[in-house]
Amino acid sequence: MMRGNSFKAVNIKVVGLVVTCLVFSPTALSERLYAQTTPTDKMDAVMSAGYQKVWNKEVQARIDRDIRTYRMADATLQFAGSVNRKGVRIEQVSHDFLFGSNTFLWGDCHSPHNDSIYSNTFGTLFNAATIAFYWRDLEPTKGQPRFAAGSPYIHRRPAPDPIVAFMNRHNVNINGHCIIYGQPFAIPAWMPDSRLQMDSLFKAHIQELASRYTDKIQRWDVVNECYDQVNRHLMPDDYTFRCYQWANAFFPKSVSLNMNECDMHWPTTDINHYVEIARNLLFRGARINNLGIQSHIMSTDEMEQMAEGTIRYLTPEHIWANLQALSKAERPIYISEVTVCAPDSTPRGLAIQAAVTRDLYRIYFSHPNVRGITWWNMVDHGGFKGEPLYSGIYDVDMRPKPVYHVLDTLIHQEWTTRLTQAPDKNGELHFRGFKGRYRITWTDKKGHRHESFIHLDKDGAFQL
């Protein structure tokens, strides 16, 4: 993949591409786009020689090779009838890999127009969404959960029902975050200080979520950040294991149950401890389908260190070592929460954010056991108190930032297969494409148009 040239070519066409993706008028969008989309050469120009040394040509070549090896598959199309020699149109219409963001500012972007931009990012740029289910804010008053539209307002905690309905209509994969979170700020204020009483309340809470959403939500972070057992709230005995037992009993088997933990900054020894917690739970019979790991760059100073190439962590070697360690749990990996903050809102700061994001997404996408990546706060100034101001892919006025265009280019251009190709002399057509669903269209020799769909998830032949 030509990292240096592909993004420059996109700049000429980027407005048209965004209009194609998003369901807004061209006029409205063109007025809101940044004047500069920061092509790759400009992003590279703000990154130091030290950064370029860390993310060198050999590293990039290895990432390219691994993406081609692990994210693509060979397809053979076999046609029952004749095919016009003008060729067959092959268009990828969806990805197996999940690219998402949280939905914490749903309906809270200061105008209906901005809210529309926010919501319509799902099903266009992103095919996955993380919806907030923090118990303390979901049920601030015991027995009065805030599920439905019109529930009392809490910042960054929108009522989940309307979001679930939207995502289901648009075939967006949903992750519920999170059922149980042991930190004091996440447990309902009305929770009794009795392990025994908490036990029955936890069980009932999990059962209520399973009953209400059944398979409408495809993935759940059952227990969030269970690694730290020192600074947590009073919790029921063996609560992590028991929560997975209850979730397994109440949710359909089609629903995936996740663990979620901090952070890719950790030394690999700490990642190994997380893996051992997961393996011990699995050994005892817990159903854990996926392992989540967070990747937050919350410090502007850290971003400057990234740009200088002096940071100790989040180097290609460190990232790969941690992903390999996580793989020892023998479960798919989700990069569950990604924050890449800009050092500031200057063109240089935005270019640094875009460049770091490009490299992090590429290496995460290249690992065979990673199944999805979720951007955390989609809008600047939209984070939790104390989190960085410039960590969005949109600014506060919902204008796409350079990092937005980086993600759009990676997901919908570099990592999407579209081609027109004629069958060989045997009537077969061979191609290698990114894993996902495809629309195949062709015309036979009598001029009749045909359309078929295939799901390419591994090497295989398809009879059309």
Segments and roles (model prediction):
Residues M1-T37:
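Bacterial Sec-dependent N-terminal signal peptides
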Residues Q36-D108, P140-T141, F147, N175, ...:
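Beta-strand-rich domain onsets/edges
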Residues P39-E58, R212, C226, V230-H233, ...:
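Aromatic-rich peripheral "rim/lid" segments of glycoside hydrolase catalytic domains that contact
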Residues H95-L98, T124-A128, N168-N173, D215-R219, ...:
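Loop/turn elements at helix/coil->beta-strand transitions in domains of secreted/extracellular proteins
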Residues N102-W106, Y134, I179-Y181, V222-E225, ...:
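Active-site beta-loop-alpha junctions enriched in small/polar residues
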Residues H110-L125, L429-R437:
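Short Pro-Gly-centered beta-turn/loop motif in secreted/extracellular proteins
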Residues N114, D263-I288, I352:
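Substrate-binding cleft/loops of secretory-pathway carbohydrate-active enzymes
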Residues T124, A128-Q144, R157-M264:
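Substrate-binding cleft and catalytic face of glycoside hydrolase catalytic domains
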